[in-house]
């Protein structure tokens, strides 16, 4: 049996002029790799959920359409995941 460490964390990110709480959860994908499920709430309290996958050298959003304030911060979300992965090991 292979043990996979559960990784979940939340971080505040300034997006669209407001601090927003992004929640991250790592899980396995069907190809044996890993994905991060990410969710955040918009101004109307609608939960926006999406996935990020490691492609080439960075974590990328793998679905759309998403609000521009989410996609504009993809590089920051990538940095937060990389930081957490370094600290979790």
What do the predicted segments below correspond to?
Residues 1-31:
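Negatively charged, low-complexity tracts enriched in Asp/Glu with abundant Ser/Thr
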Residues 6-8, 22, 36, 61-65:
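Generic preference for well-ordered secondary structure
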Residues 46-89:
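Acidic, low-complexity intrinsically disordered segments
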